[in-house]
């Protein structure tokens, strides 16, 4: 097994947090091999909890800062389920409005409008499957990428469904999405409540879901922290520096509702 820089960074971080005894557990299971034959494994304890949760629950929420691998792991688990014949298709979606910019103001057809906001999803698919195979599966509609609004009225059976950037859903959008769950399907809902781009008077569907769904047996919530950041170590420090402000904003918003 080749040990890379991210592995060393993870080990050092776990030593600092007195968790080094759990380091070996991260390498016990290979999820899948990527397009180059390199094994994909979890890199932090938070990621391990996330992967285990997806295996054990129908719906898993992954909540935490950027750089924790939420999107990449979700796509990895979806492709793994597809390759094993556990599902027949993968559906990836997200809210279509970001930072006050409506898709209606972007040129081109639907795919061109959505694609700029889905680069992390495409990057993950290309790394795991390769660009050619990803394109073929999309042409056969085995992999579908679409705005959240296009999920309305559908029942998603035999599917692995991923909602990314869920912090930017409204309460009704979140309810609409979750009620699409069909038989023999799994859902992953990822989001970062410190990066909500909704108007200040609109409550995030992700925050609302945490409050309403926490006691449903087959739904689980996994919370990532700066310790789970798998990018450059400075990124984790930046996230920690910014953590207090978003929390206070969210608390203030909830108090006024």
Where are these regions (language model features)?
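Interdomain "pre-motor" coupling segment immediately N-terminal to P-loop NTPase/helicase cores
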Residues: 1-27
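Conserved helicase motor core of SF1/SF2 NTP-dependent helicases
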Residues: 35-163, 167-257
């Amino acid at each position: 097994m080749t040990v890379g820089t991210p592995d060393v960074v993870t080990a050092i971080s776990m030593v600092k947090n007195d968790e080094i005894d759990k380091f070996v557990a991260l390498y016990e299971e290979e999820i899948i091999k990527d397009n180059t034959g390199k094994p994909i494994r979890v890199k932090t304890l938070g990621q391990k909890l996330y992967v285990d949760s997806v295996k054990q629950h129908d719906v898993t929420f992954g909540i935490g800062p950027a750089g924790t691998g939420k999107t990449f792991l979700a796509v990895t688990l979806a492709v793994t389920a597809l390759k094993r014949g556990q599902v027949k298709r993968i559906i990836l979606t997200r809210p279509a409005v970001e930072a006050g910019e409506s898709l209606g103001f972007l040129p081109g057809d639907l795919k061109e409008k959505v694609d700029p906001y889905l680069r992390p999803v495409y990057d993950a698919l290309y790394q795991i499957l390769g660009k050619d195979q990803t394109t073929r599966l999309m042409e056969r509609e085995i992999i579908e990428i679409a705005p959240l609004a296009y999920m309305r009225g559908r029942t998603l059976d035999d599917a692995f469904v991923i909602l990314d950037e869920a912090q930017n859903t409204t309460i009704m959008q979140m309810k609409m999405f979750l009620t699409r769950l069909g038989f023999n399907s799994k859902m992953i809902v990822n989001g970062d409540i410190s990066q909500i781009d909704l108007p200040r008077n609109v409550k995030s569907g992700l925050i609302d879901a945490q409050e309403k769904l926490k006691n449903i047996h087959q739904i689980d919530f996994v919370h990532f922290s700066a310790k789970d950041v798998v990018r450059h170590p400075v990124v984790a420090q930046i996230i920690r520096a910014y953590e207090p402000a978003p929390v206070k904003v969210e608390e203030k918003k909830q108090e006024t509702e």
